[in-house]
Amino acid sequence: MSRYRGPRLRITRRLGDLPGLTRKAAKRSHPPGQHGQARRKRSEYAIRLEEKQKLRFNYGISERQLVRYVKKARAQEGSTGTNLLKLLENRLDNVCFRLGFGPTIPGSRQLVNHGHVTVNGRITDIASYQCKAGDVIAIRDNKASKQLAQANLEFPGLANVPPHLELDKTKLSAKISAKTDREWVAIEINELLVVEYYSRKV
């Protein structure tokens, strides 16, 4: 399953607020479609599927990518669900979004893909790059790159920058001072349900 490129509000009407996907709010609270307003009791599978879809659409990744992250999270020590969220939060496109360099995760991915972002002084155009403590994320030192980031910083997608990201707005750079804290994950998600969804699939 490839990355979703369709109407974003249609997704948020079905799954709820996804700050990484869009900053627009859905006007109608019921799901899209002819029978969107009908209330049906959902199965446990449907609930797990919905949590999985929240994660996939918020971070803008394909099903195949998410499966890889689940496998990697499972191989690490500690809670698989927490490990999964940390892996997604540490993606370079998400870090740029959390810093305010991009309006959404797709917008931040474009910044990265177009070579506007550096990691430890080197241009890094891989959105899935795993940032780690000690890395310095910065906007490339040219006029076009700086203008893009400065415009986005005036109206950031999220109000608060996580404390482990030490942002210097004047230099358009940030140092990752510590590991990602589960408490600062922006999306409302039950990661345990996501792990349960993949328990028999991966």
UniProtKB/Swiss-Prot annotation:
SMART domains: Ribosomal_S4, S4. GO terms for biological process: ribosomal small subunit biogenesis; translation. InterPro entries: Ribosomal_uS4, Ribosomal_uS4_bac-type, Ribosomal_uS4_CS, Ribosomal_uS4_N, S4_RNA-bd, S4_RNA-bd_sf. The keyword Ribosomal protein applies. One of the primary rRNA binding proteins, it binds directly to 16S rRNA where it nucleates assembly of the body of the 30S subunit. With S5 and S12 plays an important role in translational accuracy. GO terms for molecular function: rRNA binding; structural constituent of ribosome. GO terms for cellular component: small ribosomal subunit. Keywords: Ribonucleoprotein, Ribosomal protein, RNA-binding, rRNA-binding. This is Small ribosomal subunit protein uS4. The lineage of its organism: Bacteria, Bacillati, Cyanobacteriota, Cyanophyceae, Synechococcales. Residues 90-152 form the S4 RNA-binding domain. Belongs to the universal ribosomal protein uS4 family.
